[in-house]
Amino acid sequence: MLGTHFPPPPLGPSEGRAAPCTFQIPDGSYRCLALEAEESSSEDGLQGEVRLVDLEEEGTSKSRVNHGTPPLSRAPAIIQPSSCCREARGGFQHSDKPSREWDVVQARKVMTASVSSSPVPRVAQKPALGRSTSFTEKDLKEAKERSQRIAAQLTTPPSSNSRGVQLFNRRRQRVNEFTLESRGQRSPKLSQEALQTGHPSSPIGHAPGLSVNPTSPSKPGSPKHSSSQSPSRGVPGHIMEGYSEEASLLRHLEKVASEEEEVPLVVYLKENAALLTANGLHLSQNRETQQSSPNPPETEEVPSPAADINQNPSSPNATLTTAASNSHHNQPTADVNQNPPATITPVQQNSSETQCSPNGTLDSKPNTPSADDGQRPVPAEEVRSSILLIDKVSAPPSAASPFSREATPLSSSGPPAADLMSSSLLIGMQPSTLVASAEQEVSGHAAVTTPTKVYSEVHLTLAKPASVVNRTARPFGMQSPGTTSQIEQSPMMGRRHFGEKAWAPPASSMADRSPQPQRHIMARSPMVERRLVGQRSPVVERRPLGNFTPPPTYAETLSTAPVASQVRSPPSYSTLYPSSDPKPPHLKGQVVPANKTGILEESMARRGSRKSMFTFVEKPKVTPNPDLLDLVQTADEKRRQRDQGEVGMEDEPFALGAEASNFQQEPIARDRSGPAAAEETVPEWASCLKSPRIQAKPKPKPNQNLSEASGKGAELYARRQSRMEKYVIESSGHAELARCPSPTMSLPSSWKYTTNAPGGFRVASLSPARTPPASLYHGYLPENGVLRPEPTKQQPHQMRPSLYALSPVKEPAKISSRATSSRASSRTVSPRAASPAKPSSLDLVPNLPRAGLPPSPALPRPSRSSPGLYNAPVQDSLQPTAVSPTYSSDISPVSPSRAWSPRAKQAPRPSFSTRNAGIEAQVWKPSFCFK
């Protein structure tokens, strides 16, 4: 076999990647475990041979691992030729020795698969290619030597942990060494295995011939199943016979190593968990190997159920592995290859049918697992070895039945379907990959196109160790259905086969859930395969009976119309989830890649339906916009001023300058009201100013806020006010005084009110009214005087800007609350009469204070505003004093206005405590009513 397999080392470059020799070393020890289990069953000679064969098979399985084909399938091919082929030749009625050989081979295979699976990522290293070359050049003797070396190395490491590490490194090296060789060996062994274990599943049965065809490129020496199988059988027989002596020594060494390494195996698996996970198939195979090789007797016991179960799916494989191995090792080229090439639809339909006949155990073996079990207690182990393959294959047989049903669409691609099947064998797990590809075809790939794809990609898989690369790429790409999906699917399917032993019951439920599991739809075959693998336990019987049929139904998606529609829809849907239809194969063979891509895509899809990450309702701001309040209040003031009549205000803004022009209307009302009647004008004044501004805002801030109220804004106000004073105020002394304190004092609510105040400044009558308040607030007079002119100049602009929105709002609110009393007092009382009525005097005062000075007296003014009110009306009569009265009047009115908290409340402006006190608001109310 090695000689036969060595010719294809040209494929070895890619195959070499797949075949890890390093893994073979632990595999030997693992085989020792299997051999130990079989030694108990007195299979030492055969096991030695099998072990030697397994070493070869390790290379083959490693190359298969690189191909993405489960190494397990190859090992059975090698071992089956000796035992299973003998069983096939001798019928299912071989003694337990062949079956135990199968167990040994299976355990070894599984371990080999797991060992080789771990280093698959490392296969690329290929450090000791010279060894692999020498190995290919050298005979089985060198393989014996290597087996001995491996056994010695396995036993040599002092500590289990260090052994695990050393074994891992050695396996890496050996994998790299045997990469080329393993690939050369892989195809014939794979084809043998496919013929033996693979043929039971007609996809594998088909695959062997085609597998040999793709294998023939890799290995022209083994172009056909029978040719490669018979040489392989002969070689394994010779190998096992020739090495039986050394194999016993190796067995003892491997026993020691395996005993020593049974823990290291676990440690190794743990250490190599990442690699095993990366090669999920091998990880699951390792688990199976650990399960089957530690439990080969259990597996034998389970094979009765597992033979039932696995032989339901797998015993067709097993029976086909034996009988079909006989018929398909002998027939495979004619039966499998002929059927698929001749008519993939008939053969695949005959896959379900022929495989129902050879696999007749397949369809009939769910019904006749017992017969197969009776016949296949030996194949049961073959079923184990073929469980990986046959479970994988049996899912394809189920897939093969659907695949044959699919074969109807695939029939047009008859040879390509055979290629798919061959790629299934090539990939080793690709019966399920074929099922995946068949389901891909079912999903939406053109039946012909997908098989052709699969065939080409299968060749690529064989030619390339790209299976590993495809594995890496496939989870992401997943678009290339044939190559990567099959390759990845086969390992992934192996994962599912092995990992989904628990899946077996879910598999049937999955069959029921088939429409729901979109990925599982395509994963049905893998799930069936998983179930088969998992159902080596009696659970598997349920699955072949229930789930085994549903997977064909899933695979039958093409054949069975309703199932086809269901399966087609979900595969198409799952195809939508993956980049392309290959995803359903990924669902089968590439569970992890499919999950990866599917998770991302599903998460994306879910995200679409989900609320955006930042879906939070922003609570609307309840606070009124100062600008809006100012606008509203200003409009109200303007309307009131207009009602009062805009007189003399036009001249004032020009004197004040462009700044004052903004507030012309308010000053006009104030001016007009001032000259007409200081008392009434001031109340009207206040009403205009207060109703819009004070009412809108509650009393927020005192004069202190006004004084504190601005940085640059206050400075700008002060400067503007000083300028305004220069133009508007005749008395420079007051202007200067106002200029100094005004920046802070004028900034508060008085500023906006200063908008109205400019009229007071502009009109002498207003200024006299302001003058008495100034006298009242002597402490604030300079500040108020300073603030007044500044408000007159600066407030007009910035009072209406939202800078001082609080004061306008405050004034309107206060105006409304105090309007009635203020109106009555201001109306009925003359400026002096209003002096006893603080509201009226405040009205007179606020007119001017708004104009300029409310800020300075703001806080103190509320208390002083009452006397200021009395003084304010008196000075209202003194209105003739224009400049200084204006400032003083501004001061006093501002103080009342500040006593009215509304202006102070009007945000930055509420500088006047008099307004905060609410004095002005009261006065304004009368003035408003006076309107």
From Swiss-Prot:
The modification Omega-N-methylarginine is found at R850. The modification Phosphothreonine is found at T549, T771. Keywords: Actin-binding, Cell junction, Cell projection, Cytoplasm, Cytoskeleton, Glycoprotein, Methylation, Phosphoprotein, Synapse, Tight junction. The modification Phosphoserine is found at S134, S202, S222, S258, S490, S514, S569, S691, S742, S746, S767, S835, S856. Induction: Depends on the long term potentiation (LTP) and the activation of NMDA receptor signaling. Expressed at high levels in brain and at moderate, but still significant levels in the heart, skeletal muscle, lung and kidney. In brain, expressed in the cerebral cortex, hippocampus, olfactory bulb and striatum. InterPro entries: Synaptopodin_domain (IPR051976). Residues 214-232, 569-580, 816-841 have a biased composition (Low complexity). Actin-associated protein that may play a role in modulating actin-based shape and motility of dendritic spines and renal podocyte foot processes. Seems to be essential for the formation of spine apparatuses in spines of telencephalic neurons, which is involved in synaptic plasticity. Belongs to the synaptopodin family. This is Synaptopodin. It comes from Rattus norvegicus. The gene is Synpo.
